[in-house]
UniProtKB/Swiss-Prot annotation:
Keyword RNA-binding among UniProt keywords: yes
Keyword hit for Transmembrane helix: no
Organism for this UniProt entry: Clostridium perfringens (strain ATCC 13124 / DSM 756 / JCM 1290 / NCIMB 6125 / NCTC 8237 / Type A)
Pfam families registered for this protein in UniProt: Ribosomal_L4
Gene from which the chain derives: rplD
The protein, known as: Large ribosomal subunit protein uL4
InterPro entries registered for this protein in UniProt: Ribosomal_uL4, Ribosomal_uL4-like, Ribosomal_uL4_dom_sf
Any one GO cellular component localisation term in the record: ribosome
SUPFAM superfamilies: Ribosomal protein L4
């Protein structure tokens, strides 16, 4: 079973913690990771883009000038794509980009992402701030030399969230909001011991 250090928020190691091998010690499945990340990014897209084709633009029903004898190029409509205020060629239309991923693949991707972050994981014995204080959050991050950090708490913690939300490259979320993209996108994964237990309950 993987074993990592257990730290307090001052950066001092206070013990070790055994991680569940079914969650933090699996073989990393790159295919599942790719599929889930692509789906997650696709599902973020609004798909509300829209433009008018030449048939949808108002006007342009009459031929602007006769076909021959003017010396100018022949034209059939002032709403053709080459005209100013003309329609758009292959105009984008609203569409649904959503992708569905099987539950089993989502689980494989999540355990693969967690396993890939064990080497960059900092498990905290506890994480609380008496009041929202960015200085305290910066002090904690500096103690671990953390860069581009994802902080995972067991529950929604307003003081922790407000303390870290203004720090560039730091994301805070409760354990029930974790996702594959954010796990892979961080360089340091900072997680509380209670959050680790909750993850193991769900994915073991």
């Amino acid at each position: 079973m993987p074993k990592v250090g257990l730290f307090n928020k001052e950066g001092q190691q206070v013990g070790d913690i055994q991680l569940n091998e079914q969650v933090f010690g699996v073989e990393v499945n790159k295919y599942a990771l790719h599929q889930v990340v692509v789906a997650q990014l696709a599902n973020k897209r609004q798909g509300t883009q829209s433009a008018k084709t030449r048939s949808e633009v108002r006007g342009g029903g009459i031929k602007p000038w006769r076909q021959k004898g003017t010396g100018r190029a022949r034209q059939g409509s002032i709403r053709a794509p080459q005209w100013i205020k003309g329609g758009v060629v292959f105009a984008p239309k609203p569409r649904d980009y959503r992708m569905s991923i099987p539950k089993s693949m989502r689980k494989v991707a999540m355990t693969s992402a967690l396993t890939s972050k064990v080497a960059d994981m900092v498990v905290l014995e506890d994480l609380t701030f008496e009041a929202p204080k960015t200085k305290e959050a910066v002090k904690m991050l500096n103690a671990f030399e953390a860069k581009k950090t994802l902080i995972i708490t067991a529950e929604v913690n307003e003081n922790v969230y407000k303390s870290a939300r203004n720090i560039e490259g730091v994301t805070v979320m409760p354990v029930n909001n974790i996702n594959v993209y954010d796990l892979l996108n961080c360089k340091t994964l900072m997680i509380t011991k209670e959050a680790v237990n909750k993850i193991e309950e769900v994915y073991a």
